Amino acid sequence: MTTAILRRTAAQLFMVGLPGPTLEPATRRFLVDHPPGGVILFKRNVRSGAQLRRLIGEIHATGAGVSPLVAIDHEGGRVHRLPRPFTHFPPAAVLGAHRDVGLAEAVGRAMGRELRAVGSISPSRPCSTSARTPAIA
């Protein structure tokens, strides 16, 4: 295996963040030269739904045959990245307190529809591994 192939393969194991709301030439070049397995977006990357849709399209266009997974740090509650008119979902702790699987599934589906509309396939959600904290606030 050549060094170049090894580097490209290793890069696919990483999920990277971007510095801002646009794909600047240096960032685009980095994504082309070292295509990551995923890109995670944060508040600094989001201005509007239309801008986010364009940014995600540009991210996908950098992939050399394989588009990176695009996730957003959008958990509900205080961690809400999408501007109006997107729904402000409750935190996981509130959903968990209801102990209603149907409600949690409905919220997850609604969040998924909104994220899919801008081209992101996944919210970034924390997972609790402690019996004392069955849901994350």
What is each PLM-predicted segment?
Residues D33-A137:
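Enzymes and membrane/adaptor proteins characterized by extended Gly/Ser/Thr/Asp/Glu-rich
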Residues T2-T3, P25-T27, G57:
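A generic local structural motif
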Residues M1-T22:
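Boundary/entry segment of secreted carbohydrate-active catalytic domains
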Residues L18-L23, L103, V107:
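Short secondary-structure boundary/capping elements
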Residues R7-T9, V32-P35:
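Flexible, charged surface loops at secondary-structure boundaries
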Residues M1-A4, F30, P85:
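A broad, low-specificity signal for short, low-complexity segments enriched in glycine/proline
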